[in-house]
Amino acid sequence: PEVFKSELEECKKMASTKNIDLKSFVFPGHTIGNIDHLAGLGFTSYRSNFVNTLGYPVQRPDKLWEHKSTVEFDIRPNWSMKYHVYRYKKIVDRAIKNRTNCHFWFHPSMPNQFLTDIMPALFEHIDKRRDEIWPTTMGEYTNWLNQNHSI
């Protein structure tokens, strides 16, 4: 825990020099641990669950919010670009139908082809359904939860 805490304290210090306040956390490589220390370090949420869930965030007793991921933006080699677009749109539609969260995530190193061939069609679909869905960030959603939910 001491290495975890000291590394995060240094990250927060470096981020603050750029006027960035780190509040949400993603565990590297899905190696989840030391969760009990996140709230004490000023974090308000973390992303967990790499089993693709359409669900809801859960608040821990320490007020830290756990956001379950739905799917990673990535290129599946056996799928056509058209099928990728179809699948991602279907995930959004299922979240709307079932009134659940849809938590997309990606690595900055994702293939450029995703940015050019999939994201525009998916974001257009989300925009068309904007009256049924709230496109937001994990930080904005956590702030909303903290203002509108009590444990």
Predicted feature descriptions by range:
Residues 2-6, 80-83, 114, 118:
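Alpha-helix N-cap and loop-to-helix initiation/capping positions
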Residues 17-100, 129, 148-149:
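Active-site-adjacent pocket scaffolds in enzyme catalytic domains
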Residues 4-18:
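An active-site-proximal "capping" alpha-helix that borders the catalytic cofactor pocket
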Residues 45-50, 88-151:
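C-terminal domain-boundary segment and adjacent tail
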